[in-house]
Amino acid sequence: IGIYGLNFALMHFGDDIARMESSVQLTDTGVDGMETITIHYRDGRMAVLTHSIYCRGDRKGIIHGEKGYIVVENINNPQSVSVYDATDKLLQYHEVPRQISGYEYEFQEAARCIREGKTEADSMPWDRTIQLMEIMDSLRKAWGVIYPQER
């Protein structure tokens, strides 16, 4: 369930990962129902991700730094981005054009690629997709989550 959170972390912090830690609560059917993932980067930065199907979270992405922080409202379907200084003073606010489902940007990018004869999107190249799949696979392995076709 954590693909959007993982992608958000990699988009903003990159992929120079030193290690990951995680904990999970599996559902009765054996899939991840709730998880916490901590990504430790080689340069000392850290991303902490939480995901759950049991309750509705705020879906915010918050990036903290020494001089302030950035809040992205709804990382699945961004609505706005707010930039604050270290005293919580709002410095910038950007509203994102409203979408119906949040998938419009994916459809628009696919349509653009088709029109231009591209087989790979610059915004989400295959190597990033494979990297995210490998991270998800390593988390599933650590949690003991095995898909039926993997047995």
Q: Which role does the model predict for each range below?
A:
Residues 1-4, 105, 128:
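A generic structural signal for residues located within well-ordered alpha-helices
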Residues 3-78, 97, 108-116, 150:
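Contiguous beta-strand/loop segments that form the cofactor/metal-binding neighborhood of enzyme cores
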Residues 42, 109-151:
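C-terminal helix-rich "cap/oligomerization" subdomain common to oxidoreductases
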Residues 64, 84-85:
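Short beta-strand-to-turn element immediately C-terminal to the catalytic PLP-Schiff-base lysine
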Residues 96-108, 124:
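Active-site loop of classical SDR/Rossmann-like NAD(P)-dependent oxidoreductases
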